[in-house]
């Protein structure tokens, strides 16, 4: 199929959306979605077209791949003040294969950037991989990145990754296929340079289930939340890791984005984004590790508060909790380490370190270690180590160290304390 055409320009209203890509013919690849039209003065931007779906598989061939979402949602024109970026198109789904491997899902398009006071557009989601009757499942498409804001505005959210396709069972005369890989989540867009929040990272796609006798694939890692560049803005949260296919490990959670630094002497700094949770493991698979919390922004002169460290993501079932983020300079507290997930031995995350004291201000208290996960099968998880207290500056005192996390209960043996 041919690519979709760009949307027509609006006269008094919003710009048109990009056309969708045509679906592929039998055994053929589809067209990509067209780009959204750019916004003119005082108009909003068009949304990027969606990618076409893959064509049906031929008698012995694999299905066509999903088309990519439009490369960019439209960007606000330089003469426009309040124009938001267009959203990226979604990737098409890969076709299921009767004989051969499932086709890959298309990638999501990136969100467009905002104009002077516009927010960024959201990234498109990745398409799902096709399932296989006699072969491997297709990979999920990658989520598109969120668009960045102008001077004032929020960043666009990152798109989610597509899920991997299911592999075939080893039936007589058939090939046992592995599951497709989950697509990565898209990165969140940056907040405005003066004010605005950074956006959340996209969720990682789930790993595909493997055919009988094969392990499923590992879930994809959640994307990192983007930092905010403006005053009082908060960092985006990390995307959640994808769930593992049967027998496959869960994907790791994305890290939290950095908190924004206040530009005025009296404004407060933004807090860190939290780390994404680790994906749960498939049956027999290990849970993914939680993402670490980001570091809190430092305080400015004349006592604006430092941002608190982001919370570590929880471990997926059986996975380790992510570490808490460190507090910014002048911060009161480091973040608490995340609790380890229940499982065979989920360990608690490490507490974040307390921030350094500002002039004549005491150091921050270290975050508490996460609790170990409780197990019904074997030993409980260990508690996480407490964070270090922050050092005092000038004539100020240092911060206290964080408490260790409690050990998880075991079926027969209790876990050790932090």
Question: In which residue ranges do the predicted regions lie?
Answer:
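Collagen triple-helix signature
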Residues: 1-418
């Amino acid at each position: 199929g041919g690519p979709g055409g760009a949307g027509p320009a609006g006269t008094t209203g919003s710009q048109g959306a990009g056309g969708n890509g045509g679906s592929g013919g039998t055994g053929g690849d589809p067209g990509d979605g067209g780009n959204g039209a750019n916004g003119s003065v005082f108009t909003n931007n068009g949304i990027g077209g969606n990618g076409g779906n893959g064509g049906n598989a031929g008698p012995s061939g694999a299905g066509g791949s999903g088309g990519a979402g439009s490369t960019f949602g439209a960007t606000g024109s330089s003469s426009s003040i309040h124009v938001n970026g267009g959203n990226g198109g979604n990737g098409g789904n890969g076709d299921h294969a009767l004989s051969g491997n499932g086709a890959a899902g298309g990638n999501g398009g990136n969100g467009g950037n905002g104009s002077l006071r516009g927010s960024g557009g959201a990234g498109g989601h990745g398409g799902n991989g096709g399932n296989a009757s006699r072969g491997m499942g297709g990979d999920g498409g990658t989520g598109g990145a969120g668009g960045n804001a102008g001077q004032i505005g929020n960043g666009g959210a990152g798109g989610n990754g597509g899920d991997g396709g299911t592999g075939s069972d080893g039936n007589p005369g058939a090939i046992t296929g592995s599951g497709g890989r989950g697509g990565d989540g898209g990165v969140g867009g940056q907040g405005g340079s003066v004010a605005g929040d950074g956006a959340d990272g996209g969720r990682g796609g789930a790993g595909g289930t493997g055919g009988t006798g094969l392990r499923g694939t590992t879930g994809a890692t959640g994307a990192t939340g983007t930092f905010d560049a403006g005053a009082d803005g908060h960092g985006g949260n990390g995307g959640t890791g994808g769930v593992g296919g049967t027998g496959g490990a869960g994907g790791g959670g994305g890290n939290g984005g950095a908190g924004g630094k206040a530009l005025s002497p009296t404004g407060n700094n933004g807090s860190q984004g939290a780390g994404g949770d680790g994906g749960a493991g498939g049956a027999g698979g290990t849970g993914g590790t939680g993402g670490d919390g980001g570091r809190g922004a430092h305080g400015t002169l004349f006592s604006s508060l430092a941002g608190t460290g982001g919370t570590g993501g929880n471990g997926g079932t059986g996975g380790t909790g992510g570490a808490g983020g460190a507090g910014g300079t002048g911060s009161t507290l480091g973040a608490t380490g995340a609790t380890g997930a229940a499982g065979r031995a989920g360990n608690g995350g490490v507490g974040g370190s307390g921030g350094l004291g500002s002039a004549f201000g005491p150091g921050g208290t270290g975050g508490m270690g996460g609790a170990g996960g409780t197990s019904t099968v074997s030993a409980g998880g260990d508690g996480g180590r407490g964070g270090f207290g922050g050092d005092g500056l000038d004539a100020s005192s240092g911060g206290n160290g964080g408490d260790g996390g409690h050990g998880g209960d075991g079926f027969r043996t209790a876990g050790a304390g932090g």
